[in-house]
Regions:
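Cytoplasmic membrane-interface regions of multi-pass membrane proteins
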Residues: 54-70, 136-147, 203-204
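Alpha-helical transmembrane segments with an aromatic anchor "belt"
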Residues: 102-175
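Hydrophobic alpha-helical segments and helix pairs
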Residues: 68-121
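N-terminal juxtamembrane cytosolic/stromal segments of multi-pass membrane proteins
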Residues: 1-83, 94
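Hydrophobic alpha-helical transmembrane segments of multi-pass integral membrane proteins
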Residues: 41, 82-100, 126, 130, ...
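Terminal transmembrane helical module of multi-pass membrane proteins
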Residues: 165-237
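Alpha-helical transmembrane segments
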Residues: 29-46, 113-127, 180-189
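Membrane-interface segments at loop-to-transmembrane junctions
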Residues: 71-78, 146-155, 213-219
């Protein structure tokens, strides 16, 4: 029966109906929510551009010197400026992370592509909230308020440096037809390097007031635990 339908008078009969066209996923930068978020990021950076430029000298000093973070915290206006810039940079960081596919757990398939960046921002805010809770629950003793603020905000310094480097780097690589997997690897490497530097600086701050074992325990509870929770959710969920 089947052969009779396929072959008639010694010829292969094929349907003349056109094959259905498969829709390809929309380009990341063509999704409307991403366009809006990109424009918002640019507007925020332009609005605070003067503050960002003023922050460069104390930020570089804080990154270069072991006690540079303390001097930045003593400068109240610079510290507030740093915190504001770190908050502003959260949006472009999440946009780059989503563009590179840096966070893709199993349940991410349920997230519509147009809301993937917003979901990534939610994960980032959850990380900051968990880190804040860790600092509220685990307070190292024998530390002044200024020293604790230096420890808590040290990550912000490296986060700002990371975004300042990652934005132009990830923006330029596609112009040279670099593969997406390589771009993602570069972003993950930059992020890991920035977190490693921030962890080392936190170690130095804690070690100056603690013996090695308590330093390791505090470091794990305050910095490594929140980051490990994000990595574990990406791998296990």
């Amino acid at each position: 029966m089947l052969d009779g339908e396929l072959f008639r008078q010694g010829r292969l009969e094929m349907s003349s109906a056109p094959l259905p066209e498969f829709q390809t996923p929309a380009e990341w930068n063509n999704l409307l929510p991403n366009k809006i978020a990109i424009v918002l990021s640019v507007v925020l950076v332009l609005v605070y551009l003067k503050d960002i430029i003023r922050l460069i000298p104390p930020l570089l000093y804080a990154l270069d010197r072991k006690r540079g973070g303390e001097s930045l915290e003593y400068n109240v206006s610079a510290a507030r400026m740093r915190n504001t810039v770190a908050l502003i940079y959260t949006l472009p960081f999440c946009l780059i992370a989503d563009y590179c596919g840096a966070y893709r757990p199993g349940f991410w398939s349920m997230v519509p592509p147009e809301w993937s960046s917003a979901a990534t921002l939610g994960v980032m805010l959850a990380y900051f909230l968990l880190r804040r809770l860790c600092y509220a629950a685990i307070r190292p003793g024998k530390m002044s308020a200024e020293s604790l603020a230096t420890l808590k905000h040290s990550l912000y310094n490296y986060f700002i440096a990371l975004v300042s480097v990652a934005v132009p780097t990830i923006g330029i690589l596609p112009l040279f037809s670099v593969r997406e997997d390589i771009i993602s690897t570069v972003f993950l490497a930059l992020t890991g390097l920035a977190f490693a530097f921030a962890t080392v600086r936190a170690w130095q701050i804690l070690k100056s007031r603690r013996s090695p074992l308590p330093t390791i325990l505090y470091l794990c509870g305050l910095e490594i635990l929140p980051a490990a929770a994000v990595v574990a959710s990406a791998v296990l969920l």
